[in-house]
A protein has these predicted regions:
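Basic, flexible Lys/Arg- and Gly-enriched helix-loop patches that mediate nucleic-acid binding at interfaces
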Residues: 2-186
């Protein structure tokens, strides 16, 4: 099995490909005890890859975990603003995990984690055709006309957003509960 070093690191569950490229550019990655000088170098499964002295191995078995993400928590490994991350809630003895997609900082709900970067990417792509369900609570009354517009697609600031399925779950004089079914995160 031959693949680029950045992909190898991502598939091993160490970090994303972009983060792997940054580590390579910072001269933190070694292949068979030789400094890796570019993220496009091909490696084989039996090559010895180290990052900061730690041996990186491919995960043969894809693992999948589910987690409840509370509000005011971010879906990243390192936050420059020092906010809490979902990874701080994981058990200390848990293998390295990658979030599959993200939820906004103020959002709460189910988030999936895996140990395999390729698997995460496949599930994140709109072409995977996986339906994501979001419940949104709005502190106002929503008109059924507005829902129809969203269901048929809308243009916001000159950008056409594809149609999505939105339904009103509950509504009273002060607030509305909406259910969104999306095939992509935008």
């Amino acid at each position: 099995l031959i693949m680029r070093i950045a992909k190898f690191i991502s598939n091993a569950g160490y970090c994303s490909r972009r983060e792997a490229e940054k580590l390579i550019n910072k001269k933190k990655v070694y292949i068979n005890k030789k400094l890796c000088v570019a993220p496009n170098i091909n490696v084989m499964e039996n090559d010895k890859i180290t990052i900061n002295g730690n041996i990186i191995k491919l995960n043969k078995k894809i693992r999948l975990w589910k987690m409840y993400k509370p509000t005011n928590v971010i879906c990243t490994n390192n936050d420059p603003k020092k906010r809490k991350t979902i990874f701080e809630f994981l058990p200390k003895n848990m293998p390295r995990a990658i979030s599959i997609g993200r939820l906004d900082f103020m959002s709460e709900g189910l988030i999936l984690l895996t140990n395999n970067g390729d698997f995460a990417r496949k599930l994140e792509l709109p072409s995977s055709n996986i339906i994501r369900i979001y419940r949104v609570y709005i502190a106002t009354v929503v008109k059924s006309n507005d829902i129809k517009k969203i269901n048929y697609g809308v243009i916001i600031n000159g950008i056409l957003y594809k149609k999505i399925e939105v339904t009103i779950e509950k509504m009273n004089q002060k607030k509305t509960s909406l259910k969104f079914k999306l095939r992509e995160g935008k």
